[in-house]
Amino acid sequence: MSLILASTSAIRRQLLDSAGVDYVAVKPDVDEAALKARLTDPTEIASELAAAKARSVPGDDWVIGSDSVVSVAGRLFDKPRDRAEAAEHLRFFSAKPMRLTSAVALARGGRVDWSHADSATLQVRSLSDKFIETYLDAEWPEVGYTVGVFRLEARGVQLFDRIDGDHFTILGMPLIPLLGALRERGLLQS
């Protein structure tokens, strides 16, 4: 029996690798836009997307699905389509609190057996246009693959005045609860 990560996210692979988890990564087959179109609550969206990704891989292997959602001033944000939209997002985020919700689900045989969601609040500092351009010069296109236009493990940490919440949740996966769930199922040593 294998453990599968239904994700193409580099940071989620890095988190599992660093924790010593053996897994195989596959691209999930999920219509994210359709799911997001019928939901409005960030926690519900992240949880449903994580569950859908975990259910998307057929067979008897355990499958991890995970997703993150960013909301600022009541508005949900997707990954930017291009650098210009990334700059627009950053200008909108400036001097506002950002809520980042990450969820993770564990499924087997197309059925979710366990899930967990967590949120963090990140206070975006006041960002000048010059900073935004310099930041994107250094971080684009990598931040184009993230919903908040930042990588906390890189220059993205400079966007914030204060961060309240779990580090792993902010990186994109509530890792500590997931590791506990894997141990409970005998997928990691206890």
For the regions a protein language model found, what residue spans apply to each?
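Cofactor-binding loop segments of dinucleotide-utilizing enzymes, especially the Rossmann-like FAD-
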Residues: 8, 28, 109
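A short beta-strand-loop structural module common to alpha/beta enzyme folds
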Residues: 24-34
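Anionic-ligand binding patches
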Residues: 2-3, 39-190
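Flexible, glycine-rich phosphate/dinucleotide-binding loops
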Residues: 12, 32-34, 113
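N-terminal beta1-alpha1 ligand-phosphate binding loop
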Residues: 1-21
